[in-house]
């Protein structure tokens, strides 16, 4: 049997009070529906049907080249009607897994348990026990066996006391699913075609109905408004923080960290408060991340340190390298072993060699800097001529004095010294001292202009 996943994502989400389709609202910097698609892919599904409606242009622009079949639900007439739109893409021998684009925290392990619970040619539904089941469809059992699902608005007083509720997530044999969908009626309080009605049909047809439950109820919570969205965000962040701690990271305060991607950590990593991780971030052993740092798609080697309020994006730090506080590493930047940049240093598309330092107030762009180099405060690599970028090469052992401009393309030879305040436009040979300052003048008795009173 092939696994065919149907994701329902057609709703507008009026209670979000937004022009953005509900399923595109983000959890951890990724749309809710993208979380669901990623989980479906992790199951090894052979096909994914994405049922869409409101905001089609925005959905397709956001999801881009996803490996999904786009299935239009022109009118939103209920969950059963939504699934029926995908009938043409469902084979009789498929196992059809039905998911929801606004339920982003469902786990692969839970869905595997649901699929494992389904007997051959039977169906399995994901249920959860809630202390306050108000608003949810109730699971109706007779002698322990599931016989149907009753929606809140259609339930009687006895049924309203049931605490086991329907999550909407189910695994159904393709052949029977299409038959049951064709038999759905909208004769109910909402005048909609309820997908849940197929459970009673399965019972009537003698089909086995099994159940599974998630490890946590938050997995099956949806977001209909921004308050619920924030609750899901916090649950996601709590789970992500716990994962980091179990893998060897020390979090100063697990409630004050934001993980918006995939973070891999070594042992004894220390992460201070209000740190943001985005994209793919790799931290080696004994790495220290200071408060307020932002790390995006970067690699930090063993014993390196990111000091407070430093931004590292698309960059690499070698062993025992350090950056910050208040430094910025832009894409293509690399600090080799024991290299250091300090406060208010920006480095882009450049390599700072082993043991080299730029302590403060410098811009390093499109540069190859060797080992043991000192970059003085206020140094700027002038890499852009208004049309093209040019390379600055600074070889091993160079000392660059404060307030120096290097006008690229230019090469500074080994162990050269550039005097403070110099503008370097030509190559410098090894071991040379170069000073380009104008001659200092002394004007005696100089009077500063006096501001005229109005």
From Swiss-Prot:
Write down the chemical reaction(s) this protein catalyses. alpha-D-glucosamine 1-phosphate + acetyl-CoA = N-acetyl-alpha-D-glucosamine 1-phosphate + CoA + H(+); N-acetyl-alpha-D-glucosamine 1-phosphate + UTP + H(+) = UDP-N-acetyl-alpha-D-glucosamine + diphosphate
EC number assigned by the record = 2.7.7.23, 2.3.1.157
Which residues of the sequence carry a binding annotation for acetyl-CoA? 377, 383-384, 402, 420, 437
Pathway membership, UniProt = Nucleotide-sugar biosynthesis; UDP-N-acetyl-alpha-D-glucosamine biosynthesis; N-acetyl-alpha-D-glucosamine 1-phosphate from alpha-D-glucosamine 6-phosphate (route II): step 2/2; Nucleotide-sugar biosynthesis; UDP-N-acetyl-alpha-D-glucosamine biosynthesis; UDP-N-acetyl-alpha-D-glucosamine from N-acetyl-alpha-D-glucosamine 1-phosphate: step 1/1; Bacterial outer membrane biogenesis; LPS lipid A biosynthesis
Q: Which UniProt keywords apply?
A: Acyltransferase, Cell shape, Cell wall biogenesis/degradation, Cytoplasm, Magnesium, Metal-binding, Multifunctional enzyme, Nucleotidyltransferase, Peptidoglycan synthesis, Repeat, Transferase
Location comes to: Cytoplasm
| UniProt region (N-acetyltransferase), positions on chain | 248-454
Binding residues for UDP-N-acetyl-alpha-D-glucosamine, per the UniProt record? 8-11, 22, 73, 78-79, 100-102, 137, 151, 166, 224, 330, 348, 363, 374
Cofactor(s) needed, names only, are: Mg(2+)
Give the start-end ranges of region Pyrophosphorylase: 1-226
Chief subcellular location equals cytoplasm
MF terms from GO for this chain are: glucosamine-1-phosphate N-acetyltransferase activity; magnesium ion binding; UDP-N-acetylglucosamine diphosphorylase activity
Annotated Gene Ontology cellular component terms? cytoplasm; membrane
At which positions is Mg(2+) bound? 102, 224
Q: Which family does it belong to?
A: In the N-terminal section; belongs to the N-acetylglucosamine-1-phosphate uridyltransferase family. In the C-terminal section; belongs to the transferase hexapeptide repeat family.
* Quaternary organization: Homotrimer.
What does the function comment of this entry state? Catalyzes the last two sequential reactions in the de novo biosynthetic pathway for UDP-N-acetylglucosamine (UDP-GlcNAc). The C-terminal domain catalyzes the transfer of acetyl group from acetyl coenzyme A to glucosamine-1-phosphate (GlcN-1-P) to produce N-acetylglucosamine-1-phosphate (GlcNAc-1-P), which is converted into UDP-GlcNAc by the transfer of uridine 5-monophosphate (from uridine 5-triphosphate), a reaction catalyzed by the N-terminal domain.
Q: Which named protein is this?
A: Bifunctional protein GlmU
Species assigned in the record? Shewanella denitrificans (strain OS217 / ATCC BAA-1090 / DSM 15013)
Gene symbol here is glmU
């Amino acid at each position: 049997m092939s696994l065919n996943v149907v994701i329902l994502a057609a709703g507008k989400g009026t209670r979000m009070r937004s022009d953005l389709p509900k399923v595109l609202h983000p959890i951890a910097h990724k749309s809710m529906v993208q979380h669901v698609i990623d989980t479906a892919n992790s199951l090894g599904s052979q096909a994914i049907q994405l049922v869409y409606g409101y905001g089609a242009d925005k959905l397709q622009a956001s999801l881009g080249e996803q490996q999904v079949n786009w299935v239009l639900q022109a009118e939103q007439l209920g969950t059963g009607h939504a699934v029926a739109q995908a009938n043409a893409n469902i084979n009789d021998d498929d196992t059809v897994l039905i998911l929801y684009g606004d339920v982003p925290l469902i786990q692969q392990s839970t869905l595997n348990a649901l699929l494992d619970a389904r007997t051959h040619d039977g169906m399995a539904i994901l249920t959860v026990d809630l202390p306050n089941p108000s608003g949810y469809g109730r699971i109706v059992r007779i002698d322990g066996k599931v016989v149907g699902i009753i929606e809140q608005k259609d339930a009687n007083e006895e049924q309203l006391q049931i605490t086991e509720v329907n999550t909407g997530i189910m695994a159904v044999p393709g052949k029977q699913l299409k038959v049951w969908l064709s038999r759905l009626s909208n004769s109910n309080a909402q005048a909609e075609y309820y997908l849940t009605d197929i459970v009673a049909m399965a019972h009537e047809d003698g089909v086995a109905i099994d159940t599974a439950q998630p490890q946590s109820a938050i997995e099956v919570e949806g977001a209909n408004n921004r308050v619920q969205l924030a609750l899901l965000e916090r649950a996601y962040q709590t789970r992500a923080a716990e994962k980091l701690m179990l893998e060897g990271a020390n979090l100063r305060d697990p409630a004050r960290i934001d993980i918006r991607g995939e973070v891999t950590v070594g042992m004894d990593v220390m992460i201070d408060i209000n740190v943001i991780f985005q994209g793919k971030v790799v931290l080696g052993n004994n790495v220290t991340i200071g408060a307020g740092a932002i790390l995006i798609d970067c690699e930090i080697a063993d014993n390196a340190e990111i000091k407070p309020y430093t931004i590292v994006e698309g960059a690499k730090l070698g062993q025992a390298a350090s950056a910050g506080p208040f430094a910025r590493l832009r894409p293509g930047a690399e600090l080799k072993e024991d290299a250091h940049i300090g406060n208010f240093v920006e480095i882009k598309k450049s390599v700072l060699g082993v043991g080299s330092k730029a302590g403060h107030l410098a811009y390093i762009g499109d540069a190859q800097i060797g080992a043991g180099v000192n970059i003085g405060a206020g140094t700027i690599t002038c890499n852009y001529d208004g049309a093209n970028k040019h390379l600055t090469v600074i070889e091993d052992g160079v000392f660059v004095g404060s307030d120096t401009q290097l006008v690229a393309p230019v090469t500074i030879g080994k162990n050269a010294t550039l005097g403070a305040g110099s503008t370097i436009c030509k190559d410098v040979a090894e071991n040379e001292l170069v000073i380009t300052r104008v001659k200092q003048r002394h004007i005696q008795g100089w009077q500063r202009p006096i501001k005229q009173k109005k």
